[in-house]
Amino acid sequence: MPEKNRNRGGIMKRREWASLIILALAAVPALLVAIGQVYVTGVDGIRLRRPETIELLAEIIVLFFLYLFAIWKIDRNRLRAGAALLITAGFLWIHQAFTAMFLSGAYVLVLLMLGARLRRGMDRNHVWREYHVITGLADFLLGSGCMIFLFCIGSLLFGCGIRSFRLLTVIIAGFLIGFRFMELRTAGDDGKPWRQIPKETKISLEMSACIAIILAMVLLQAGRMNICADYDSLHYGLRSEYVLDNGGGIYENLGMVNVVYTYSKGLETLLLPISGLPSYGFFLSFQIWMTLGTLITAGQIVELFVGRKHAVGCMTLLSCIPGIMNMSITAKTDSMTVFMQLVMLLFLLLYIRRKKGAYLVLAVDAYLMTLVLKPTALVFSTAAAGTAGLYILLTKQLRFKFRGSFLPSLGFMIPMWLLIWYRTWLHTGLPLTSVFNSIWAALGITDSHQSNTDGGNCGP
């Protein structure tokens, strides 16, 4: 009997292999024909044969091997980090993107520091690990929400504009740096976890190659950033000083007749301090940081279930998908929206795993953040959060303790959401525009300024 079962198993394996071979013989030629029509004789083939495309691909290959050598061959961590930073700075300088990436990165750092200050105020028992990836994601979420809230209040109550917000950002940054410096001086070595990093770490060739691919793919977008801007970016994303804040705050009615100017402007409000500068690169380079955050968050979700090695593999795979990476060089809100949606899912999964109320509140914070970034996020974020919420309720996993739950963060996240939506309501009489106009009409809710939303995309 066992011998008969083995024979049957052998026959089934042979049949499976035969089926796979037949499918491969049918699929491979069709795939090759499609690739040839798209990338050889098609429009993409023409683009790939352009000199600037070939030059950039050659640069990326060289960049990959430079990163690979630095990560794989250099064991001393400080020297490895210095080499990677030098390679990155050199590439950005060649492509005239260094200043933009540096300034936008400094603004990201300010948001992280602001969020960290808020988190430490709510985390009295010091449960959250400093300088940890998940902690950093929470800090960025809290800092971004608080900054948008401050800008909304400044616009609503005092009519502050872009210049005032730049000054406010510099003041906040100075205060945070000074306060943190004093904290570190009094904490000693216990408050400086980077002192505990080992001097040398050996990284395998496989892991080094993955990290090198990720860095090269991210810098590929930085290299493309200054070539040209897409239509939607020029249409509204890069013109905040004209279509959002013309000096009197974000609630000033500038008389625009295009529906896109009535969208939820959370990202544009957040980036007011780096808008209206001599180059659009400052705004666009912030999107590259958001795409990097998307890769990191996706890696954290994978690491939560299958470990760090697979997490790096996931990040490598995602960094090679054009649909994800191309969002990093457009001024549209897609990149940060995806980032915040992944952060929301990460904190929901962490709550299911660890049953800490802080994760649940942070998931709600991330959900509210997505609502101010993109009108259609109401559909997709609600679907994702609702599915996770139903799972938590149906499996009876809802456990909530107010202590250490970060519940005070809702004190500025909810007003932030309402204040961004208030701008749309003020200009149109509707809380949301875009694809929701027909829904409002079916419910009998009419636009008080119909030219704003019925004008479609007919003009600026």
Which role fits each region the language model picked out?
Residues 48-61, 100-104, 263-264, 287, ...:
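Membrane-interface micro-motifs in multi-pass membrane enzymes
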Residues 216-305, 310, 314, 325-331, ...:
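Active-site lumenal/periplasmic loops and adjacent helix-entry segments of GT-C-fold
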Residues 390, 403-460:
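Membrane-lumen/periplasm interface segments of specific transmembrane helices
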Residues 22-38, 85-99, 176-179, 204-231, ...:
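Transmembrane signal-anchor helices characteristic of membrane glycosylation enzymes that use polyprenol
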Residues 2-195:
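Membrane-embedded, hydrophobic transmembrane alpha-helices
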Residues 76-79, 133-134, 157-168, 195-208, ...:
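Membrane-interfacial entry segments at the cytosolic side of transmembrane helices
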Residues 85-89, 144, 211-215, 286-305, ...:
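Membrane-embedded helix bundles of polyisoprenyl
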Residues 94-97, 157, 277-278, 305-306, ...:
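Transmembrane helix irregularities
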